[in-house]
């Protein structure tokens, strides 16, 4: 096979979401065509998806330093620095991208050891205040009590505006961001000095400060909600959301790659995880019409087991119930859509039969990664399950006991 045909194959693999296969093909091409800086940048993005931050930075920085002028490559480099806690380097990249609201805030934090743990080798298990409509965790923010919704669909920790001011969060620049169902919300970037989960502390976190939408707050009429705890924290650990026991477990990374389970150990591979730009958490899901499609894991979307854009209905073999509507909630507020039902849906070892979902009119995530994101997995699918996000190994595990 000639190199032109091989390149076409690599790009087709990537467009279909075959990330591991395309990585191997692009690595071969890069070895054969070392002058192709776009190949270096693509390998950097693939490493970013795999959360291999050292490799991502090496590929992307080399391509840019050798003359590549592509805003996407610079954005991916900024993200890699940001996840790694090198906030000063991230600030420089975001400034070059014109994102001055974020860049200025990160520059002020540039000399700090971001996400520093007060007990680096400790594990923590924190019970939830409630499980439905979404899991809520009681924490302390700069010493002030707070209730945070657990949401794998959020990147940074989000705090309500007035609460953040009262808690002494240092506020910086602003940007417009997009949340659930494509809803826009204005965010202010800030510096949180300490987030405490029991005796377990995480220091110097970048956070986003927003006005909590009334639609989200209305789902918790008897409990004040002060913000959202997202993947920016979860990705530092082997994170378990135990919907059975109603608790969050954070375990430090180990070299074994073995995920501890409630009744012993599970040995063997799980389902792949990827982290796209803005810490967008992706995994593989099976439906009758499509095996191993890539989906957004958004545990903070309630009101349906899953959600799909209108454009994917045919490919996924789904039919809409025209006489029914569902209402969900996310970081951007209420999400409304028509009801759809799948024959079955499988996430790792969890299989649900006849799950209800929502058809979204707007799903910006669908083509934002360079490959099709088929839809999102929500809270209702995960209820009564044990979900482990093994970020050190970039694998997802569902308990064998899921029913």
Residue ranges and their predicted role:
Residues 1-403:
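Pepsin/retropepsin-fold aspartyl endopeptidases
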């Amino acid at each position: 096979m000639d190199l032109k045909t091989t390149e076409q194959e690599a790009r087709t693999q990537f467009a279909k979401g075959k990330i591991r296969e395309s990585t191997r093909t692009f690595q071969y091409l890069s070895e054969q065509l070392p002058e192709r800086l776009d190949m270096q940048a693509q390998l950097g993005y693939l490493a970013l998806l795999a959360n291999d931050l050292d490799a991502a930075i090496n590929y992307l920085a080399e391509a840019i330093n050798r003359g590549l002028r592509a805003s996407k490559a610079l954005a991916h480099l900024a993200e890699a620095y940001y996840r790694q806690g090198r906030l000063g380097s991230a600030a420089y990249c975001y400034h070059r991208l014109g994102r001055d609201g974020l860049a200025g805030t990160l520059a002020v934090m540039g000399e700090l050891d971001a996400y520093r743990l007060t007990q680096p080798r400790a594990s923590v298990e924190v019970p939830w205040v409630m499980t439905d409509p979404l899991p809520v965790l009681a924490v302390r923010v700069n010493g002030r009590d707070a209730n945070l919704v657990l949401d794998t669909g959020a990147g940074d920790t989000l705090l309500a505006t007035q609460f953040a001011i009262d808690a002494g969060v240092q506020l910086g620049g602003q940007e417009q961001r997009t949340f659930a169902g494509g809803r826009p919300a204005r965010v202010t970037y800030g510096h949180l000095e300490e987030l405490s989960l029991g005796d377990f502390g995480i220091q110097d976190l970048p956070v986003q400060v927003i006005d909590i939408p009334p639609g989200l707050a209305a789902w918790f009429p008897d409990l004040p909600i002060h913000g959202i705890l997202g993947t920016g924290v979860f990705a530092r650990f082997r994170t378990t959301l135990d919907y059975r026991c109603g608790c969050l477990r954070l375990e430090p990374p180990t070299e074994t790659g073995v995920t501890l389970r409630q009744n012993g150990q599970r040995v063997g591979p799980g389902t792949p995880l990827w982290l796209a730009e803005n810490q967008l958490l992706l995994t593989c899901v099976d439906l009758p019409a499509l095996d191993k499609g890539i989906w957004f894991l958004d545990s903070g979307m309630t009101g349906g087991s899953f959600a799909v854009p209108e454009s994917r209905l045919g490919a996924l073999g789904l039919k809409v119930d025209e006489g029914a509507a569902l209402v969900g909630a996310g970081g951007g507020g209420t999400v409304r859509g028509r009801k759809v039902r799948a024959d079955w849906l499988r996430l790792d070892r969890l299989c649900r039969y006849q799950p209800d979902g929502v058809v979204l009119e707007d799903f910006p995530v669908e083509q934002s990664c360079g490959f099709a994101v088929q839809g999102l997995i929500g809270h209702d699918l995960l209820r009564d399950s044990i979900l482990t996000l093994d970020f050190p190994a970039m694998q997802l595990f569902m308990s064998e006991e899921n029913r």
